[in-house]
Amino acid sequence: MQTRLKKTLSMLVLSIGAFSMNQNTFATPELKLTDKWDKTFVQSKKVDHKKVMFKNRYGITLAADLYIPKNAKGKLPAIVVGGPFGAVKEQSSGLYAQTMAERGFVTLAFDPSYTGESGGEPRNVASPDINTEDFSAAVDFIGLQPNVDQNRIGMIGICGWGGMALNATAIDKRVKAVVASTMYDMTRVMSKGYNDSVTPEQRTKTLEQLGAQRWLDAKNGTPAYQSPYNVLKGGEAQFQVDYHDYYMTPRGYHPRAVNSGNAWTVTTPISFMNMPILSYIKEISPRPILFVHGEKAHSRYFSETAYEAASQPKELYIVPNANHVDLYDRVDLIPFDKLTDFFTKNLK
């Protein structure tokens, strides 16, 4: 009996060893990242910056920018930053990350799966599940940095990634505080339209069209893509003009961004149509949420209804005279002092 037990234990140890080797292999990134500073904002002299790579639990390699306060000592609080939806880390999320690093936090801005410099095929597809996982994978990475306190990690989600950050925080109890800035709930807007205006008949028709597109994609062996984003043709709503003025001008244009004249796959909405991401927002409590939104933003109702659905502690901070896109890059309007106070108080 003892001999058999020893053999069993030996086999178990060998299996664990093989599993560990597989895990090490799994964790090896293989992306080629640009070395040049190609952000839409000026590089700070107060912060050290480097490109990094890590994998999410689906095996997709993510590209990110790590920002560390210069001359930092000891274990520091950390913040992972994602968004806006269809943007890259060289845009708004990088600006937020660098600015918060100037204020004493180790920060990480990342490209979501299938976009920017991150891996994943086909290109330019989004998923409420995988993109929520991207946030938690960023927590994995930043929490393993030698200068980061694993018990003091927060999140910032911008635009459509505000909803993703809330979803990730609900499920990932390692996150101690979360900010949703100028947020969208992408599952709500894709399934119900702006201001919940889509009728059941319209929803059914959309799903039928998406099903038909799947037949075409399967037949062709490659996904079809939507029309280029943020190209104005005339007669657009003001918020669409605002998007153009950020993504398609020197203010915020970046060639790798979906929103800068590229496009999502036609079938990207499918999983968003049937997977509401804020179902468990109450489970973020007792960890705090800060919602930040512009007074004049077309999207303000997303933060207001999410705020009502969330449990305490929570706060909704309205930025006077700001529209949706202003909170992407207008450093005179983004309430960085408010964000700093929030994370300083709650990541301690």
Where are these regions (language model features)?
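The serine-hydrolase catalytic nucleophile loop
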Residues: 86-98, 112
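Catalytic histidine-centered segment of alpha/beta-hydrolase-like enzymes
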Residues: 322-333
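Alpha/beta-hydrolase active-site loop
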Residues: 125-146
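Alpha/beta-hydrolase-fold enzymes
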Residues: 166-246
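Conserved alpha/beta-hydrolase
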Residues: 99-119
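Short beta-strand element of the alpha/beta-hydrolase
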Residues: 75-84
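N-terminal cap/lid segment of alpha/beta-hydrolase-fold proteins
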Residues: 30-74, 328
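Short beta-strand/loop motif that positions the catalytic acidic residue
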Residues: 284, 291-293
